[in-house]
């Protein structure tokens, strides 16, 4: 979906297809047919933006087969779909029964991460619409927080530098500018905007021409970051926000109550990691690596609100006594695109947890899932039009 900002520029809104974790190219094409096109039809749009997730095997196929890449581009066009952004964070296996910490491998100290991201950039340059010259890719924020050590930290920065050089060559050869954004996430080496600034302004850091940050509003909320402060931190350091992921975290205002913890327990599922945080009265953020840890006697204080890294549908907050952090989403979006110029032009709704919601809220067939995704996009659309942006067809 495209929107015209009051300054005349185009802002793109998409939904991320990692909610349909296809591992190979046939699976990707099935996603377009069974989900993405039906979502577009539900919204009554001639064109819908999607943020493709391409697992390792699908990406390797497309890079190695120009005919397959052209066919995918043609199918996107025929189904009324367009791609200006990719989710490059999960490498493969995102549909596994247990993902948890596996999603952080390979990290930026490993060659596979660099090669995969390079492949994604080449693919995106070929998939961009004819009238679009800028693409974005979100990626792992270096690594899980296990201390990198100086040698591994140097290797990660070196890999990002090589990527920046490759993106410059791609830009010169294709005329398309592909930028990659580290996506700060609770529990990782880069958890916050301040962490990202520290990494991307350190000696040996890559040029900001092609390497920046992807802001995820669920992650900001989970870490109790103030959106304005986070954005100011990046802008003051000259770090571009190449993309923003529109998402909401799970919020428990009074976790000391038994009924609240019982409600939270319904979200403590085995597939994904649900980092949980609280902020003490003196502003210190404490947390656990997973919700289940917080619910047992983990030492996490119950005297202040908890927030959990569980992406809940934007339009459908959980039932009381729980809530979601759409207030953080609204504040971030107002700052990102509500000013005189947009601070990013790529927005992506990312709720990959539909299949792991409590049973009463979970869509039990493809039709209901498409309904839910369309409702989320309609919610995001309304937020944008309330900020003065106007819908525009491709």
What are these regions (language model features)?
Residues 1-126, 132-135, 208, 360-394:
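N-terminal pre-domain/capping segments
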Residues 2-5, 97-212:
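Active-site acidic/histidine proton-transfer and metal-coordination neighborhood
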Residues 11-17, 46-52, 82-87, 133-139, ...:
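Hydrophobic faces of well-ordered beta-strands that scaffold small-molecule active sites
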Residues 21-30, 54-68, 145, 187-191, ...:
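Acidic-and-aromatic substrate-binding clefts and catalytic sites of carbohydrate-active enzymes
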Residues 25-33, 62-66, 151, 156-167, ...:
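Distinct, well-ordered alpha-helical segments
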Residues 90-99, 138-140, 145-146, 218-224, ...:
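Flexible glycine/acidic-rich beta-alpha junction loops that bind and position SAM and/or redox cofactors
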Residues 167-292, 303, 312:
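Acidic/histidine-rich catalytic cores of soluble enzymes
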Residues 286-389:
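Flexible, acidic glycine-rich loops studded with aromatic residues
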């Amino acid at each position: 979906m495209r929107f015209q900002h009051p300054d005349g520029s185009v802002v793109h809104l998409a939904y991320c297809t990692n909610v349909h974790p296809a591992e190979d190219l046939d699976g990707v094409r099935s996603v377009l047919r069974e989900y993405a096109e039906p979502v577009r039809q539900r919204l009554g749009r001639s064109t819908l933006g999607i943020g493709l997730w391409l697992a390792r095997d699908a990406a390797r196929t497309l890079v190695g087969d120009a005919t397959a890449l052209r066919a995918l581009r043609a199918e996107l066009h025929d189904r009324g779909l367009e791609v200006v952004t990719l989710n490059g964070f999960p490498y493969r296996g995102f549909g596994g029964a247990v993902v948890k910490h596996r999603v952080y491998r390979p990290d930026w100290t490993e060659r596979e991460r660099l090669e995969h991201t390079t492949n994604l950039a080449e693919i995106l340059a070929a998939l961009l619409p004819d009238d679009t010259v800028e693409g974005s890719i979100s990626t792992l924020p270096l690594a899980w927080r296990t201390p990198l050590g100086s040698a591994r930290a140097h290797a990660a920065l070196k890999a990002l530098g090589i990527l920046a050089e490759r993106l410059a060559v791609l830009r010169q050869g294709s005329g398309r500018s592909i930028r990659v954004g580290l996506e700060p996430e609770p529990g990782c080496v880069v958890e916050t905007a301040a962490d990202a600034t520290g990494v991307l302004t350190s000696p040996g850091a890559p040029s900001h021409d092609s390497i920046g940050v992807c802001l995820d509003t669920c992650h900001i909320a989970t870490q109790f970051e103030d959106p304005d402060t986070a954005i100011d931190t990046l802008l003051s350091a000259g770090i571009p926000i190449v993309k923003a992921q529109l998402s909401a975290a799970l919020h428990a205002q009074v976790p000391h109550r038994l009924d609240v913890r019982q409600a939270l327990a319904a979200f403590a599922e085995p597939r994904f990691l649900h980092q949980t945080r609280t902020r003490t009265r003196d502003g210190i953020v404490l947390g656990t690596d997973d919700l289940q840890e917080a619910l047992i006697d983990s030492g996490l204080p119950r005297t202040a609100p908890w927030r959990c890294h569980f992406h809940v549908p934007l339009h459908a907050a959980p039932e009381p006594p729980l809530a979601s952090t759409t207030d953080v989403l609204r504040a971030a979006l107002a700052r990102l695109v509500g000013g005189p110029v947009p601070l990013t032009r790529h927005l992506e709704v990312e709720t990959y947890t539909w299949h792991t919601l409590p049973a009463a809220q979970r869509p039990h067939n493809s039709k209901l899932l498409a309904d839910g995704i369309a409702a989320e996009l309609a919610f995001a659309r309304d937020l944008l039009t309330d900020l003065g942006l106007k819908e525009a067809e491709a």
